[in-house]
Amino acid sequence: MRLLVILIIPLVFALNSCSKKEENNDESNSSSSTSPTLSDNATSYTVTVSGGKYFLDGTQAKSLKFKKGYTYYFDSSDSSTNSHPFFIGTTSGGGNYNGEYTSGVTNSRTTTGTLTFVVPSDAPSTLYYNCGNHSGMGGTITVQ
């Protein structure tokens, strides 16, 4: 009986220490409070459209917080995005491509693919995601 207790106590401490480490990693790796983390510096969003608004991971006009040097993916493969070219800009609104921001951006204006954004070190502190065809669909990106 004593041997069993002696073996169980270190096991309990080891398991407790692992769960605390995982909790700490979850908080420090998050670039957005509700976005799934792909790795330490890459996050993906699923883009859909409903009622004339962009939804990112099911949330309408979601405000985002990005970090310089990190990579962000916007998957616009859902059929609801077919007539809504997704792009990143320096001005809010949309409905045109005025202020389109292309530094670090791959596949801008996509309607069926994935826009990739590697945030450059000289990115403005505020950007926006917009639709090139319609105004008022997007949201704000704060760059830190």
Identify the residue ranges that each predicted region occupies:
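Bacterial Sec-dependent N-terminal signal peptides
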Residues: L15-D40
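Short, surface-exposed beta-strand/strand-loop-strand elements in extracellular ectodomains
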Residues: S83-G93, I141-V143
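Solvent-exposed, conformationally flexible loop/turn segments
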Residues: K67-T71, T112
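Residue-level hotspots at or immediately adjacent to binding/recognition sites across diverse folds
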Residues: F74
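Sec-dependent bacterial lipoprotein signal peptides
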Residues: M1-N16
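Substrate/ligand-engaging "lid" and interaction regions
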Residues: G95-G99, T110
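Extracellular/periplasmic metallocenter environments
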Residues: P36, T43-Y45, L56, S77, ...
